[in-house]
Amino acid sequence: MSKTLGLINIDSKIPNLALMKVSAFYKTKGYGVEFFSPFKTYDLTYASKVFSYTPDYDYYPGNVVKGGTGYIGNAVVLPDEIEHTCPDYSLYPDMDYSMGFITRGCIRTCNFCIVPDKEGYIKPNADIDEFVRHKNLVCLDNNVLASEFGLEQIEKIIERKIKVDFNQGLDARIIAGNPDIAKLLSRVKWLKPLRMAMDNIGEAEAVIKATELLRKYNTTPKRYFVYLLVKNDIEDAYARAGLCKKYELNPFAQAYLNPKLSCKNITKEQINFCKWVNVKIFFKSVDYYDFKDTRTSRLYKSLKGESVLCF
């Protein structure tokens, strides 16, 4: 009788890359693999968690391996033999895109980001041939443009006419400082609009310059997506949101949370600001301070979805 493996995606039902790799690897070892059921027992269980504030399971039967950024300091890192296994996309039958990391790490040392501690300085991780099995691709790289290997892989993506989304965002400072990279990105077929980040007002100049270069070389769609990190300085976030509106960019606000703390520790004003930015009917028609100070701010409670994400 074959051994069995249970998989737990603790955060959500969104496709989990690590679990897909684990599934593929253990299937080659003859294991029967399925998503975890509390009514069954398994020879081995893998649990993956992205966010530290997501409640863990109270009880795991049998032998459990825990991994992911949500387990700060205690996460198991996948060994190379699993890390470089093509993901088992059959775990998510409706998934119409491939997923993976071309590079790991980053050249930046942002104090709010766990990547420098978790992955170190930027380095090549995998050729797209290792994990691409669809015509659509979601790359999870943190700073792919900072790597020559990453740029070579983008060329390969272009040549193969793969639609791609770098869903962690592209470094606006690199784009702003190198028109050749803006030209390269203009040749990409985008699965979703190109993403950048403006985590503080000091990054505004780079985002504006990058936007101008990208539009100059006709990188489309031209309404680029911009992550806004929202800390306690709401004035800073408000100024950044205003620039996004001025330059016709599409902002998405994320309330900053120290990863060692609970999501409950974010402030009400952080939440209100994220609601204002992310519920577009408000962002386009009402100033934040009017939204904050009038009954309008109560309207979002009737809308589906929280429209706020801790980062």
Language-model segments: residues:
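A short, structured N-terminal alpha-helical element that caps or precedes a catalytic domain
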Residues: 1-66, 71-73
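Short, charged, surface-exposed secondary-structure boundary motifs
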Residues: 43-45, 57, 73-81, 111, ...
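Ser/Thr/Gly-rich flexible loops in soluble cytosolic domains mediating phosphotransfer, phosphorylation
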Residues: 65-91
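N-terminal pre-triad scaffold of radical SAM enzymes
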Residues: 5-15, 87-123, 134-141, 145
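Core AdoMet radical
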Residues: 8, 46-47, 114-210, 221-231, ...
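Flexible, charged surface loops at secondary-structure boundaries
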Residues: 1-2, 36-43, 57-61, 93-95, ...
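A structural motif corresponding to the C-terminal lobe/cap of the Radical SAM core domain
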Residues: 188, 193, 202-311
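A short helix->loop->beta-strand "cap" motif at the edges of active sites that frequently abuts
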Residues: 3, 60-65, 162, 219-222, ...
